[in-house]
């Protein structure tokens, strides 16, 4: 197995990249450390969200991180051939589970749907995208083929269309106030940061905040892809999210490890960036 340094991965990272081909094989492995899989092009342990994760396809992993809550990590090859994982969630619900972010490609979303059909009492029946980049919206066409809507803010829909990316369905009456998507999920626009449209998802039952690419993992040593970022406003937006959800027991970033404090790490990286500029 080829291992790349964390710095090399992050220097090459881009959320808007195109996905590599995803294998159709659905033979799930037993939970194991990533290193146990071997082979070229696989991410190292530090780059997936957690350990262990179950590999359900060539570029798709899942792990239960709380009762009725699953982390999914999907990977894509980006410039230089580096493999970069993206985190998302599956929230189990009695009448149909919720997918938070689709992965990079339709094939990856298809694998997540197949897995949910087999492993969850109520398969995925709805989805949300936390911003317009491909690692959040790339699987929309697969979901739509199954008559599953992917909701997003009106700004996310507009930006996806502008950048010729899969376009979600707009959430009605979405504004500055937190917006409930049922009793177990709330979404909130804290302000511009990684992108102008990034939102966070709050899971009150678990007291978990999903920050998406708006927040950086503790293993990140820079801000990653900032092509669409609003760096001057980013720190204030992070503080706004922290103030909105002060009871968060876990905060999940869009890429990398879900351990530690991504809020503090993001603020530190922003301070470092400001010092350098």
Regions found by a protein language model. Name each.
Residues 1-20:
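N-terminal secretory signal peptides and thylakoid transit peptides that target proteins
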Residues 42-44, 67-77, 157-160, 181-185:
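Short Pro/Gly-enriched beta-strand edge/turn motifs at strand-loop
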Residues 23-64:
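C-terminal segment of N-terminal export signals and the immediately downstream linker at the start
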Residues 63-114, 200-211:
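Conserved beta-strand hairpin/beta-sheet module of binuclear metal-dependent hydrolase folds
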Residues 57-59, 64, 96-97, 104-105, 146, 151-193, 197-265, ...:
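Metallo-beta-lactamase
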Residues 262-277:
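Short, electropositive alpha-helical surface patch
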Residues 95-97, 107-151, 246:
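Active-site metal-binding motif and surrounding structural segment of the metallo-beta-lactamase
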